[in-house]
C-alpha cells in the first residue's frame, strides 16, 4: 500500500511527531511505500535545524532527515504555517530580509497542494 503521513505536533513536547516517525519506520519495514510526510500547524517545528535535544534524547529532526535521505520520502512543510512560526529557507529569508534561514536540509516548503496531491495518489493518509 502507498501511504502519506500528516504531522501536526512539534518534534518535542507531545507524542504526535515521535509516533508518526515510528509509524513511518514500521511502514517501510513492512514493505509499504511511504510517499510523503506533510508537516502542518505545530508540526513544522520538526524542520527547525536549530533544534538541539539533550544528548540522551533521540534527535527527531535528524531522524526525519535520514528517512528522506535513505528512502526518498518527501518531507513537505506547510509554507504558511512555517513562516508564522519562524521556519524559513534561504529563499524566504532573503525575501523577508532575515539574517539567516533555519530549514533543515531534506525538508521542502510547500503549499497545501502537496497534501492534496498525496491525498489523491495514496491509498491511505494517516494524521498524527
Swiss-Prot record:
Determine the domain of life of the protein's source: Bacteria
The protein's location, in the record's own words, is: Cytoplasm
Q: Name one GO biological process term.
A: tRNA wobble position uridine thiolation
> So what EC number does this one have?
2.8.1.-
Task: Give the primary localization class.
Answer: cytoplasm
Can you list the disulfide-bonded cysteine pairs? none
InterPro entries annotated for this entry?
DsrEFH-like, Sulphur_relay_DsrE/F-like, Sulphur_relay_TusD/DsrE
List the GO terms this entry assigns under cellular component, sorted alphabetically: sulfurtransferase complex
Residues at the active site: 78
User: A single GO molecular function, which one?
Assistant: sulfurtransferase activity
Q: Provide the alphabetized UniProt keywords.
A: Cytoplasm, Transferase, tRNA processing
List the Gene3D superfamilies. Answer: DsrEFH-like
By sequence similarity, the record places it as follows: Belongs to the DsrE/TusD family.
Q: How does it assemble?
A: Heterohexamer, formed by a dimer of trimers. The hexameric TusBCD complex contains 2 copies each of TusB, TusC and TusD. The TusBCD complex interacts with TusE.
The free-text function statement in the UniProt record for this protein reads: Part of a sulfur-relay system required for 2-thiolation of 5-methylaminomethyl-2-thiouridine (mnm(5)s(2)U) at tRNA wobble positions. Accepts sulfur from TusA and transfers it in turn to TusE.
Name assigned to this protein: Sulfurtransferase TusD
Amino acid at each position: 500500500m502507498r501511504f502519506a503521513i500528516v504531522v501536526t505536533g512539534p518534534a518535542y513536547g507531545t507524542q504526535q511527531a515521535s509516533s508518526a516517525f515510528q509509524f513511518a519506520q514500521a511502514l517501510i519495514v513492512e514493505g509499504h511505500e511511504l510517499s510523503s510526510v506533510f508537516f502542518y500547524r505545530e508540526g513544522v517545528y520538526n524542520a527547525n535545524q536549530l533544534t538541539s535535544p539533550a544528548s540522551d534524547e533521540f534527535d527527531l529532526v535528524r531522524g526525519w532527515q535520514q528517512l528522506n535521505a535513505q528512502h526518498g520520502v518527501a518531507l513537505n512543510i506547510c509554507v504558511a504555517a512555517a513562516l508564522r512560526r519562524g521556519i524559513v529557507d534561504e529563499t524566504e529569508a532573503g525575501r523577508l530580509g532575515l539574517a539567516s534561514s533555519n530549514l533543515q536540509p531534506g525538508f521542502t516548503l510547500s503549499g497545501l497542494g502537496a497534501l492534496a496531491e498525496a491525498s489523491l495518489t495514496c491509498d491511505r493518509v494517516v494524521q498524527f
